[in-house]
Amino acid sequence: NTFLTCGIKYTQHDSKESIARKCFELIELGVDSIHTNSWNVNFIKYISEFNIPLQGHVGFVPMKSTWTGGVKPVGKTLKEAIKVYEDIIELENIGCWAVDVECIPADILAEISKITKMLTISIGSGSKSDVQFLFAEDILGYHNDSSKTPRHAKKYRNFDKIYQDIQKERIKAFKKYQTDVEFKKFPSKKHSVLADQKELMKFKKLITDWNNGNK
């Protein structure tokens, strides 16, 4: 009963027809919805005509961060907040069923969530949304360097340390294996299979005869 949404990089497609074919391929594979991320709005309109469920994205877009003044929240000024609102309404009018709202002020999203009919999915935009989202990398703590963890994220485990410990154990294991091989501790009898002695004697005699030219 898992609802699966899959993202497509529209930059890898040079036409609406190309991206439509990719959408249909994913739907045939069992995907329930297509995540449009930072698609061109004309692409989104075109795909919506095929009644494919679409999930939009507004607010901070990492690949467009230079357009919004760098890696920082979007929507803190009236002008930016209005743009976020207009983008959401446009996606709603196109027919999107949900929208990611990334890194906008929590109180701005709270007001927008009261108005839009779409499900709002908060990514660092406060608790007044229908759904909360965090990347697994942030939840699991893949980055030991706290400067790489976004302000809005919370680390529930330190997988970076776990992976470092695993790597240390890998190195220890390979070194121990190397030492055992060098000092003939591996393989031992329990790691090997021996032939029946009678069969072994027959084999040794046979190859001796062969080597002596008595085939």
How would you label these PLM feature ranges?
Residues 1-215:
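Alpha/beta enzyme core
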